[in-house]
């Protein structure tokens, strides 16, 4: 068996196209333009690349992009004052604070200063709690992207056994909550899980989000399972730097029914879902129906 390759790049392009259609409809029918504000503190090179990509794609789908690039020495009071202004700006429907923040800033305090309705990363404690109790919330972008691809590939997820390897607040925990919401039977595995391979082999859906290069091999995969690889790891191989996931693609693809590659799998979905969340936030703020299929 050779697994079907789930093309996240193509799927993300489809999501962005759908968002662009809905944005055009909002403009034409209601005179509303969704706005996304991205806040970057400091000059971390990777963060600068991410912020640039987010701004570019925001404009491409017809939204307004607001970029706030602050010096590394920005005080907590200055950052919180900016967030307060964005919270009260009617042109801004989504706010994203690029992480990590410089060490002198309290990330939890900053994230929880956001208006939960504009927290398009889904990290505010209110959104975390609402997701956990099955209420309408802003859903973290990467798990949302995984869910969209799973729904597209499998249709209904109800009754399937799902194993999420990783328990981070950004991916593992919200992914488990989303799968519970789809009526999966969910196991969250982690570094202390005994006989991890055996646990994973019980999964119809296996989500790897543990941050360890190629840890999940074909021996961990149930024949025919759907494998979602969230990992992004840079390793040295044959004198070159290579990007790999948490799954050993070659061996897992021999067993799985479908699998996401790295790169080109989950990664492109993250920004696409950020745009979808901004659209959703805009619709909610204006009392308009949310587009179907773009949120949990």
UniProtKB/Swiss-Prot annotation:
Entry-linked Pfam families: THF_DHG_CYH, THF_DHG_CYH_C
Keywords: Amino-acid biosynthesis, Histidine biosynthesis, Hydrolase, Methionine biosynthesis, Multifunctional enzyme, NADP, One-carbon metabolism, Oxidoreductase, Purine biosynthesis
Pathway field: One-carbon metabolism; tetrahydrofolate interconversion
Catalyses which reaction(s): (6R)-5,10-methylene-5,6,7,8-tetrahydrofolate + NADP(+) = (6R)-5,10-methenyltetrahydrofolate + NADPH; (6R)-5,10-methenyltetrahydrofolate + H2O = (6R)-10-formyltetrahydrofolate + H(+)
Keyword Transmembrane helix among UniProt keywords: no
Enzyme Commission number(s) of this protein: 1.5.1.5, 3.5.4.9
InterPro entries linked: Aminoacid_DH-like_N_sf, NAD(P)-bd_dom_sf, THF_DH/CycHdrlase, THF_DH/CycHdrlase_cat_dom, THF_DH/CycHdrlase_CS, THF_DH/CycHdrlase_NAD-bd_dom
Residues the record lists as binding NADP(+): 166-168, 191, 232
Statement: the UniProt record of this protein carries the keyword Cell division: no
Gene Ontology BP term (one): L-histidine biosynthetic process
GO cellular component annotations of the record: cytosol
GO molecular function, one term: methenyltetrahydrofolate cyclohydrolase activity
Assembly behavior: Homodimer.
Function: Catalyzes the oxidation of 5,10-methylenetetrahydrofolate to 5,10-methenyltetrahydrofolate and then the hydrolysis of 5,10-methenyltetrahydrofolate to 10-formyltetrahydrofolate.
Protein name: Bifunctional protein FolD
